UniProtKB/Swiss-Prot annotation:
Record's keyword annotation contains Metal-binding: yes
Family assignment from sequence similarity: Belongs to the TRAFAC class TrmE-Era-EngA-EngB-Septin-like GTPase superfamily. TrmE GTPase family.
Cofactor descriptive note: Binds 1 potassium ion per subunit.
Binding site for K(+): N225, T244, I246, T249
Superkingdom of the organism of origin: Bacteria
Cellular component terms per the entry's GO annotation: cytosol
Residue sites binding Mg(2+) per the record: S229, T250
Sequence ranges assigned to domain TrmE-type G in this UniProt record: 215-376
PANTHER family tied to this protein: TRNA MODIFICATION GTPASE GTPBP3 (PTHR42714), TRNA MODIFICATION GTPASE GTPBP3, MITOCHONDRIAL (PTHR42714:SF2)
Compartment annotation: Cytoplasm
UniProt keyword Glycosyltransferase present: no
Protein name in the entry: tRNA modification GTPase MnmE
Entry keyword set: Cytoplasm, GTP-binding, Hydrolase, Magnesium, Metal-binding, Nucleotide-binding, Potassium, tRNA processing
Amino acid sequence: MTTDTIVAQATAPGRGGVGIIRISGDKATDVAMAVLGHLPKPRYADYCDFKNASGQVIDQGIALFFKGPNSFTGEDVLELQGHGGQIVLDMLIKRVLEVEGIRIAKPGEFSEQAFMNDKLDLTQAEAIADLIDATSEQAAKSALQSLQGEFSKEVHELVDQVTHLRLYVEAAIDFPDEEVDFLSDGKIANALYKIIDKLSVVQASAKQGSIIREGMKVVIAGRPNAGKSSLLNALAGKESAIVTEIAGTTRDVLREHIHLDGMPLHIIDTAGLRDTTDTVEQIGIERAWNEINSADRVLFMVDGTTTDAVDPHDIWPDFIDRLPANLGVTVVRNKADLTGENLAMTEEKGYSVYRISAKTGLGVEELKQHLKSLMGYQSNLEGGFIARRRHLEALDVAASHLQLGKEQLEIYLAGELLAEELRMAQLALSEITGRFTSDDLLGKIFSSFCIGK
């Protein structure tokens, strides 16, 4: 870890009412003496002159000094809050850099220092960037929950439970005569099952948090002329796609990024799925399946004038059978203005079925509410947290090792192999909070932060 003292502008570049310069490190006190002529009382606002090396006043403002470790970074921190003109702030940074041993901070380096000094774990540090980058109220609330340690708490509890069970298993291994009795008495199995169940709950919450942060990818799929492009236009609120009566009008993937009450939604319109000899249409259909395979949700668009069926297995079994196993599907029966169907949503064998008219807008608002619900929208979000793709991947790895450990226990009563799977699960979970994380990953994470954060 570097011991350099760093400086950067903490407020956004450009013109503003207030501009803040942040200094962190051992030389922060030297900067205070050079620029202010004195060291402010820790944690007190001090109105004073900011001076250059000749004693001329550069600006006037508030100086705040935080004595380490009682600061955001865990080091001595000095903040100079002056007027927000960029020229003035640049002059002030230039003055600070005249003090020996000071350099400009790299992106995210203040947060990295806080992480290295155990002021934040990795999920909390990431939550700072997520809070700044939040594009909706839901995302901001969830990022704040993560910053306050909600996600970390869940992960730490899992790590503690896995560690405790691992120690119990390894203790049994140390007494080989009793090992089989230990492994078969049910206590280890029950503890393992509880951990797997808890991890499943955390995975579901993290998946929801990832959708809130990154948005949900929804693919509209179905046969040609079912009204897919009309639905895209209805959801987007504009004419994004060309709509005609000619089957196969859409031959490529069309994308729209919208917000439903602040929740980010990525809508993908695809070519109608059918057997065709048209080379261009075949390429479009291949791209459609690529989008479907990476979707968070599929809206299975059905022309209601062609079938009365509501169970997707009855409507088009080959399509449903080809979908990824865990991909959620919502059946959308279109052209309700022609069929006269009741617009009420129904559940059919685990599938939500909506009746709409993409052309007239009938039922589209109810479908939007459904999508918001899938994304975890709540008017008053409590207890949720934000998550990133790397968190989901780490949770998946941990779950995989726990399942392998379960097999070693139930089938082979293999204590050493169970202990190894528990160790691997522990490592995967610890990567989330940064307890065991490679330097390359840390560099990648913090380099995506703003300078000054």
